[in-house]
Amino acid sequence: MIREGGCLCGAVRFKAEGEPLNVRICHCRICQKAMGSPYFVRAQFDQRALTVEGDAARYASSENIDRVFCKRCGTRLFAWRRNGTLAGVALATFDDRNAFVPTEHIWVSEKMGWVTIEDGMIRYEGTIPT
């Protein structure tokens, strides 16, 4: 199955083929700042499953990840690993924003103090253990 999405102004569009590898809510401080939100809800795909068209820009938010956003409207679309493996697609940027449901929380140790997690999903204090 192919799911499509894009930015607020329509200048950047993407297609995601297949099912995501995982769907997580990240509470890390970098995601909080990059998204301007208490957390980043994303569906993670292999980069080869994604096709992106339009005028997107990148910002190196850490040594491993670029944040991809629309140059025109500023919509934050992806957390893109520089090693060419994975990309986290912001869930709300899919045309069908209810296509995927998160199953886990990561970096709960960095969540904002007023955020409560009472959804019964798996929680990790940091990243997923290897």
Label the model's feature ranges:
Residues 1-130:
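A short Gly-Trp-Pro
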